[in-house]
Amino acid sequence: MSLQLFGHPFSSYTWKVLIALWADETPFKFRMVGPDHPENGDELRRRWPFGQFPLLVDSDQSVVEATCIIEHVQAHHPGPNRWIPDGELGRRVRFLDRVFDLRVMANMQAVMFDALRPAEHRNPADRSIARERLRTAYGWLEANLDQSPWAIGEQFTLADRAVAPSLFYADWVEEIDEGYPQLNAYRARLLAHPLVARAVDEARAYRPLFPLGAPDRD
């Protein structure tokens, strides 16, 4: 049975996995989750009752969480790229992966999910806190990211795949202004990467779904 990936082209965590699969030219069947494909949503919830994606099916095994999926594929279907290096570099990659998911992505999503609520249930205070935390993350990244092309140097790793969708959408929620020149330059390099550009283009048709309104850029 070939690999099956349940997800959506507009989903940041789906991007994270897609970029790795595309880069390694790993064969897989994409099963889009959405109103036009109810059978995929049903199968996703059967395998993972929380209904969250991405989810990878490998024979009779279901693997959830984007980072876990990438580690599973690297272990069982290795390609030419080493997404998590060994040793100290690998620990740095895992640390940055957590920073990008928990400090950038999570706060971006907090603002976005609040916008999806009915107006009477929205919480401006929570949105303000999440935006402030995004600015804190921007400041930390500006000061601590490697000055090389990618997060840990010359090698494009799991950390870069985590930050590409994180910074892409975070900038839509809380713009990364001119006060963060290194971070803006890094975001631009990420968006110029062919596989990140592919993810952006394949998601372009779904921009009307963004609850805050997609800006006229990128």
PLM feature segments, named:
Residues 1-128:
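GST-like domain detector, emphasizing the conserved glutathione-binding G-site
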Residues 45-46, 94, 146, 184, ...:
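Alpha-helix boundary recognition
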Residues 100-195:
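GST-like fold's C-terminal all-alpha helical module
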